[in-house]
Amino acid sequence: MTTQLNINSVIENAKRVITPLSPISIFAARNPWEGLEADTFEDVAKWLRDVRDVDIFPNKALIESAVARGELDESVFNQLVTDMLLEHHYNIPQHYINLYIDNIKTLKDVPASYMNHSNVDVVADLLLEKSKRDMAESYHHYDVRPMSDAIIDEQGEPLSEQVNRQMIKWTKLYIDQFLSSWTMPKREQSFYHAWLHLAQHDHSFTKAQRQVIKGLPNDPEMTIESVLTHFSIDQEDYQAYVEGHLLALPGWAGMLYYRSQQHHFEQHLLTDYLAIRLVVEQLLVGDEFKSVAKDCESRSENWFKQTVASWCYYSDMPSDVLLQHDVNEIQTFIHFAATMNKNVFKNLWLIAWEMTYESQLKQKIKAGHESVAGALDVNQVNVSENDNANQPHSVLLNDTQAVDENNSELNQMGTSTKAQIAFCIDVRSEPFRRHIEAAGPFETIGIAGFFGLPIQKDAVDEQFKHDSLPVMVPPAYRIKEFADRYDMNVYRQQQQTMSSMFYTFKLMKNNVMPSLLLPELSGPFLSLSTIVNSIMPRKSRASLQKIKQKWLKKPETKLTIDREFDRTSDLPVGFTEQEQIDFALQALKLMDLTEAFAPFVVLAGHASHSHNNPHHASLECGACGGASSGFNAKLLAMICNRPNVRQGLKQSGVYIPETTVFAVAEHHTSTDTLAWVYVPDTLSSIALDAYESLNDAMPMISEHANRERLDKLPTIGRVNHPVEEAQRFASDWSEVRPEWGLAKNASFIIGRRQLTKGIDLEGRTFLHNYDWRKDKDGTLLNTIISGPALVAQWINLQYYASTVAPHFYGSGNKATQTVTSGVGVMQGNASDLMYGLSWQSVMAADRTMYHSPIRLLVVIQAPDYVVARLLANNEHFARKVSNHWLRLMSVNEEGRFKSWI
């Protein structure tokens, strides 16, 4: 029992190095380093470089591209270098320091000739011996690695590659539930037991190895303990050793981690995986592990050689000149080179890139308010002239009268604004919102796309239930979609007919004899379909939609808003009346919409349309767990239209005029159109006028928004008909980049719309409405930071990771991806499960980046004490800031910006 508890504890702690990976059909952005944020970004970068040879800093090419495009100001970088050098004193001639800095900051690689020079070997050996004598490890530290990493096989590759191939084979067999006709035998018992049963007959193992498998314990924890003991791994190194194995295939391990969270009977899935992996490693390594002890010394020697070569190359000090110094002087030089290594300068380049963006964002806001200052009351805009090198920009509107208490009755009637449209904070909504506001008396609002509703949706047109909220939050309620009994019966029959056709096709494809006949039967139709889809993608997609609407038309549906008793549901179905009032009130507060209601309020979810795209869910709403957010929007709108809810809101101080109507639309991000999801049958005259005005303006809005968006796609030249071109891109099954998604996301602004209204933020900013004056205790701000801002940070870091380390954190080229086991994609037929974004999602061409890999900048419009209170009360967010996983800036009522570093 003690052993079992110890191993389970080790695995529980080791899981920090991977992230749960949901199936690709419900792809949700994940921060690959969420479990590591107790350490600083810089420390994690060093650790990953040591244990997996993964560099998470932008490389030389990315830095040079950023400089060339004006995204990175070199003077900012140079100032950072100067400041860093002033903080330390080195007993080294200044000209050597200057030469070293001037050379290493270019991020040039040290030529191999320097590493191979005999004098470098002599110096490295000298320092290694001195290190042994002094028992000093001040310059370097190596984490425990799997044994198989240190052993090279006959093909010249690490033995861990053979271990990986075995684990890919077995994990694919276990996970597959959708594609294969014959699933893994005994998988219902557990992954480990199913493997034990089958591996005894696997002839990729020798007869002796199969005998070892036959004698393994039935308990996976005991197996893990046995292998670790066999390899003579110290108990204090158990976690590091297990972490190395989890990082070997983080995609497959992440998928198992996800499944262990979803089903009680699979809660020990990672334990099973590690037991199998460690046994496979033991079988393949054999007795060679005894020679691995020498690996640490050889790595130390190699580290000294690299550092000596770096000093000689960057300082322009020949190795024979270095040898003329005494050992203490040499140690000083090498200590400097170790301290001022290339990663230090990569980090400075990254910080300079982020500071440049921060400065440019300030300038945009400042310029935006200066351009309208003449048209606004002096109490609404106050642009300070006190900008200088020692003071932050002072640019903000001092709009303490923006609520306009003197005209509250006028505002309640909403006469100046015809419609208010609440969009998801998704960066793709920013340009669309800007064009809507420019088209007429329309106001836009930013809120997370799940609209604050912690629900699991059970939609009639979806096979499985879906958690329609941020993935870090468990659902608390289930909402069912239903229709009249007759309509539902007809729809179910149509669904079953369609399903049986697809099932028959799949059955024929996966069986030997029918698969020989299938090409003859389906060939002509599929060939014609291929030709039509290739030549006329937009028309073929429209035709398919018409056929679907005719033969599988979804009936008019309702939602289970009111609480229902359902003994089959593990969650409460629907809400009580008080819960409806509470959720409506919270959502309206999060939208900063508690007064001045327009006649027509639209809650706009968003969705993306693309064809033949395994990663389509990555273009959906991240706040809804990789699905469209129209369902949540419809639920909230229907609640807000209820008289009893409005009466309850009135008692809480929120009065919604009787003439105000809530409706629902969906922003299609791939075509920049607004599709109506729910419009009440009865509209007041002024609400109807607003509805018609918005509809009349939409064609022009879509054209402008599509033109702006399509201009950024690399494969498009001049666009004469942007709406048609956008629809073609969304329909073309050969298009690898139907839209840019959330690429180039860089900031998250929490504040009043007046702060950014009319300013072109280039589709790089998440915008969330917030008024600190209405949030006396900071609860709303904490909610925004803990939910929407966290989702935005996860999205940001997933794009970041997929750009800086695409081989490890990305998913490769879409053209060579293989959908596997119904859960994800691989490159070819035997790779890790690729859990990041594809190359086409972040790069414009082979050597041209599109996404700018910088950490998220969170901007809060509030006084300093409000931000300080947030950091004091929210330790999780404060840790992200202090450990450099994101950047934080605030702007107060006087318009002064402050960076919280």
Curated annotation (Swiss-Prot):
Pfam families: DabA. InterPro entries: DabA. Belongs to the inorganic carbon transporter (TC 9.A.2) DabA family. Zn(2+) binds at C424, D426, H606, C621. It is a peripheral membrane protein. It is found in: Cell membrane. Transmembrane segments: none annotated. GO terms for cellular component: plasma membrane. This is Probable inorganic carbon transporter subunit DabA. Forms a complex with DabB. Its cofactor is Zn(2+). It comes from the Bacteria. Part of an energy-coupled inorganic carbon pump. GO terms for molecular function: zinc ion binding. Keywords: Cell membrane, Membrane, Metal-binding, Transport, Zinc.
